[in-house]
A protein has these predicted regions:
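Glycine-rich phosphate-binding loop plus the immediately following alpha-helix
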Residues: 129-135, 147, 162, 167-199, ...
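Short beta-strand-loop/turn "lid" adjacent to the catalytic site in phosphate-handling enzymes
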Residues: 78-127, 144, 152-164
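Adenine-nucleotide phosphate-binding core of ATP-dependent small-molecule kinases
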Residues: 259-314
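Glycine-rich phosphate-binding loops at beta-strand->alpha-helix junctions
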Residues: 316-335
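Short glycine-rich, Thr/Ser-proximal phosphate-binding strand/loop in the N-terminal lobe
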Residues: 24-65, 225, 229
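N-terminal phosphate-binding loop and adjacent alpha-helix
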Residues: 48-86, 112, 118-122
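Glycine-rich phosphate-binding/hydrolytic loop that grips phosphoryl groups
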Residues: 326-327, 333, 346-378
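Phosphate/pyrophosphate-binding loops at sites that engage ATP/ADP/AMP, CoA/4′-phosphopantetheine
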Residues: 76-89, 189-194, 304-317
């Protein structure tokens, strides 16, 4: 069950020569990979992505069942890169699909471990195993195990939760980790201001999309990829009546329809691909239908930014476009043309989840943030 290291970045310096009390192991489990990195304070020692054979992971029924498998992969990687376990000060992992949480750090405690091992999961997702792996490695070392800005961050103001159907209140789920990290980075490095005194709208552009409104450090409102603009493979906001009719048309099972709206929708449904680069090649080849759909993608996502700007009466310090698809100048240019009248726009392309996790853990180690306590009475 040995994992294959697909890519390893050069070390910043020799890890064995660095000592201190701020060495952080970062773990980010994905469906087909485990990404990890080791930082000494804010200096990255190394990072790698361990690719997993899907035939191996398919043997596990639930995400939490992969605990020993993922732990072994991480320990082997540390050994290969000459990182002694006793040199670690903290372990931080991407958080899973927990009940609604605040932004920031949470200690991995007994309640959290009971929850991810229970039948009460909000959603079965591989990120659910991350906290358990962090705890399993940290406990014998007597060091903190944390999660940070979990997928289930929910700090919505009361008005944002209310919909026209009381049984269907709005939920907050999306790319809280990357978007909040980019907002903090923009505040500190570009505006030279305290993140907790700024207002940002951040659009994450990946396979999934989500748009976040951060005011004074809190995520007070947001759009996920099922209630705003569509994405490369997500449906976005749909009219209710036709959707209800489609549900009862007999054309789809519940599972098929769920896959349609989250995985087979958006660019993929219209053009047969969710790869923005491929769509740009189609347009360059003269495909006018692709040009229209790609234009509509930016148009629909820009509307979500405009919606959130009204919540704060247009008083926005910066709009930020981030995520892998933000590398597309055509897409970001389209969005910017619609929203730059609201506030200046920063394109911060790519995903910085490992850095965001490490930075959050470092703030905890330095006493700049206090971790929350997860409580579950199930």
């Amino acid at each position: 069950m040995r994992a294959v290291v697909k890519s390893v970045y050069d070390r910043v310096f020799d890890a064995k020569e660095v000592k201190g009390m701020e060495r952080i192991l970062v773990i980010n489990p994905g469906s087909t990979s485990t990404k990890l990195a080791v930082f000494d304070a804010d200096k990255e020692l190394f990072r790698l992505s361990i690719e997993h054979d899907q035939r191996e992971t398919a043997k596990f029924l639930r995400a939490i069942d992969q605990l020993d498998f993922r732990k072994e992969c991480v320990l082997n990687a540390l050994k290969e890169h000459d990182i002694p376990l006793e040199s670690l000060s903290c372990i931080v992992s991407r958080g899973g699909m927990l009940p609604p949480c605040q932004t920031g750090a949470y200690d991995v405690n007994a309640d959290m471990l009971r929850f991810v091992n229970s039948d009460h999961l909000v959603k079965e997702h591989i990120s659910n195993v991350g906290c358990a792996v962090a705890h399993a490695i940290a406990e014998p070392l007597n060091i903190p195990a944390l999660i940070y800005d979990t997928v289930s961050v929910d700090e919505l103001i009361p008005e944002a939760r209310i919909t026209g159907v009381p049984e269907l209140p709005k939920e907050s789920r999306g790319h809280a980790l990357n978007t909040r990290a980019m907002a903090r980075k923009c505040a500190e490095e570009m505006l030279h201001k305290d993140f907790d005194k700024c207002t940002f709208i951040v659009l994450h552009l990946g396979g999934g999309v989500s748009t976040w409104l951060f005011q004074n450090g809190r995520a007070i409102d947001m759009y996920s990829d099922d209630d705003s603009g569509f994405g490369p493979e997500r449906c976005g906001r749909l009219q209710a009546a036709p959707l209800v009719a489609l549900c009862y048309s007999g054309k789809y099972t519940e599972a098929q329809l769920a896959k349609l709206v989250r995985g087979n929708a958006g660019l993929k449904a219209h053009l047969g691909t969710s790869d923005v680069r491929e769509v740009e090649r189609m347009i360059a080849g003269g495909d006018e239908h692709a040009r229209l759909i790609f234009s509509a993608l930016g148009y629909s996502l820009a509307k979500g930014i405009g919606d959130l700007a009204t919540v704060v009466s247009g008083k926005v310090d910066r709009i930020i476009l981030t995520g892998g698809a933000a590398h597309s100048k055509a897409l970001t240019g389209n969005i910017i043309s619609h929203v730059e009248w609201i506030a200046p726009v920063e394109v911060m392309a790519g995903e910085y989840e490992l850095e965001a996790l490490a930075s959050g853990a470092l703030r905890v180690l330095r006493g700049e943030e206090k971790p929350h306590t997860f409580v579950w009475n199930g």
